[in-house]
């Protein structure tokens, strides 16, 4: 049994166009804010109530940064899987501050566009940067690249899933 689990799953809307920065060696880092809301009816008044939470998401995964940079805009609905990380920083007056963020890096991160891009089907992200079939895009870093080893979580093999019904054989294999 695992000693601990650090996994965050969010479905929400992007509050502003993502900010893309680059490290000194040119690798992209995407920052975005995701709003999640819950609604309920007040027991006493019957009035509909809503509470919105804002989440800071930081994407270090190079393949997912490309997806964010090209397709994610303000208002986009996203499904995100990542990890919580708290970082310490100092403000202008020298006081220590802490920020808790949802971080997407490595193999355990997912970013899926639920409302599509420009009216097409939803796009999915999972670390790599290749296109799949079936009316959606899937970026799957769990597949081996054509070079044999994975580099930076990128995949060179497109995932041809999504429309598997034409490949389905009706015969039972036993």
Swiss-Prot record:
Pfam families linked: SSB
Identify the residue span(s) of motif Important for interaction with partner proteins: 169-174
Q: Which UniProt keywords apply?
A: DNA damage, DNA recombination, DNA repair, DNA replication, DNA-binding
Ranges annotated as biased composition (Gly residues): 119-136
What the entry lists under CDD domains is as follows:
SSB_OBF (cd04496)
Q: What positions belong to coiled-coil segments?
A: none
At the top level of its lineage, which domain of life is listed? Answer: Bacteria
| Region called Disordered, residue ranges | 114-174
Q: Name one GO molecular function term.
A: single-stranded DNA binding
Question: Cross-referenced PROSITE patterns, in alphabetical order?
Answer: SSB
Where the record annotates domain SSB, the positions are: 5-111
Record's function text: Plays an important role in DNA replication, recombination and repair. Binds to ssDNA and to an array of partner proteins to recruit them to their sites of action during DNA metabolism.
Record's protein name: Single-stranded DNA-binding protein
This protein's species is Rhizobium meliloti (strain 1021)
* This protein's encoding gene: ssb
